[in-house]
A protein has these predicted regions:
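Glycine-rich, basic loop-to-helix element that forms the pyrophosphate-binding segment
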Residues: 96-112
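Conserved donor NDP-sugar-binding/catalytic core segment of glycosyltransferases
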Residues: 129-160
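Short aromatic/hydrophobic "clamp" motif used to bind/position activated sugar donors
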Residues: 117
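Short beta-strand/loop segment that forms part of the nucleotide-sugar
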Residues: 44, 68-77, 94
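Acidic helix N-cap motif at the loop->helix transition within catalytic regions
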Residues: 51-54, 79-87, 129
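A conserved acidic beta->alpha catalytic loop
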Residues: 59, 75-83, 124
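N-proximal low-complexity "stem/linker" segments adjacent to membrane-targeting elements
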Residues: 1-59
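Short alpha-helix within the catalytic core of nucleotide-sugar-dependent glycosyltransferases
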Residues: 57-58, 83, 114, 128-139
């Protein structure tokens, strides 16, 4: 089974149609991951991602990392039910009214408490070692930033092994 198969079952699905045992499990994991002193802040930006953000947060909650993290979502002027879902899940979020990914990422970074920040998009599902891989890259001497291209659903442009560091 590919790592994204489970997450794909919730992708593009209205939150109201997701099984309560699953949403409760993700809510619980979000609570468990909240740390007052995180090493890593995972900052997700969202604009009208009501049917996709659950898959993203589910994949982040199940990432294999053995250090404290915090998850921050920036709701960037959404007009759908994105904010309602964030409230239901109990994830830390902030509203950014200035439209655009730059404003949203900056808002998240302004609230981040971690030594390292991993910026993600909320319409994407992330592989099990994504946070650890990015953090290891950032911890290398002399490294100031890391970038990854991940094709979570292989297509003709990107293979399923499309994780690259530049």
């Amino acid at each position: 089974m590919k790592w994204y198969t489970d997450y794909l079952s919730a992708y593009e699905k209205p939150y109201s149609e997701l099984p309560p045992p699953l949403t409760n499990r993700v809510k619980k994991r979000i609570r468990e991951l909240k740390h007052p002193n995180p090493l890593v802040s995972v900052v997700a930006i969202a604009h009208n991602e009501g049917n996709r953000i659950f898959s993203c947060l589910w994949s982040i909650c199940e990432n294999n990392c053995h250090f404290p993290i915090e998850i921050i979502v920036v709701n960037n002027h959404s007009t759908d039910n994105t904010e309602s879902i964030l409230k239901k899940l109990g994830v830390t979020y902030y509203n950014e009214e200035q439209k655009g990914p730059g404003f949203a990422r900056q808002c998240g970074l302004n609230h981040a408490k971690g030594k390292y920040c991993v910026c993600i998009d909320s319409d994407t599902m992330y592989p099990p070692l994504y946070i650890t891989t990015m953090t290891k890259a950032l911890q290398q001497k002399g490294v100031m930033a890391a970038y990854a291209l991940w094709s979570f659903l292989p297509d003709k442009h990107y293979s399923q092994t499309g994780l690259f560091f530049l």
